[in-house]
Amino acid sequence: LIYKKLHAGFSFAGLCLRQNSGFAFGLMLPSQTRENRENRLMEMKRVLLKLSGEALAGEKKTGFDEDTVKEVARQVKLAVDAGTEVGVVIGGGNFWRGRQSNAIDRTKADQIGMLATVMNCIYVSEIFRSTGMETEILTPFACGSMTKLFSKDRANKYFRQGKVVFFAGGTGHPYFSTDTGVALRAIEMEADCILLAKAIDGVYDSDPKINSNAK
């Protein structure tokens, strides 16, 4: 996978065959031309999109940048209207990063992060709905009337109904990131690919925000 920084004007890349300068994410398939990659993406029936919480905040760094989220919704709608089944996993970094807190127990810190992803999914889901898409939010733990409990059968039913399915709450367990969560859900849902929008421009051997020598 190739990671590109999300900002205003990004595009859903090859999935919708739309190209804007500074696209946010895409699938890189080795030894294939751009045309072949785009054709491959168009053949994919079900994809999972992973958005970092920081990506939703835009230049604000915290909370939500509504223009950015609306642009995400616009691009996803292109894919949905083309017949692609889209699932969404969102991080919680625009509200909370448990690994950066030394004051509380790691398990509790990660639980706060899981709840942050639920808030993000509720917000983004409503923006998606404002464009005419139908959505459902699933969590691996009960959240009252706000979400529905995840099951593979339930998610598949929503996909078949043409709904965008939000997978909130990560894996439901501490010590696992939402990047792990999207990989888990992709396997369970038999997705054709994962598309990631991250706040970094590549895959590194250590955190480039901390280690300037990261490779």
Question: Where are each of the predicted segments found?
Answer:
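Alpha-helix C-terminal capping segments
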Residues: V80-A82, I122-T131, L184-D192
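Short beta-strand segments
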Residues: L48-S52, I90-G91, L138-T139, F167-G170, ...
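N-terminal glycine-/serine-/threonine-rich phosphate-binding loop
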Residues: R40-E85
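Polybasic, lysine-rich low-complexity intrinsically disordered segments
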Residues: K5, N20, T33-N39
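Active-site phosphate/oxyanion-binding loops
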Residues: K50, R99-T107, A142-V164, P174-K215
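A charged helix-plus-loop insertion that forms the helical arch/lid used to bind
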Residues: W96-M119
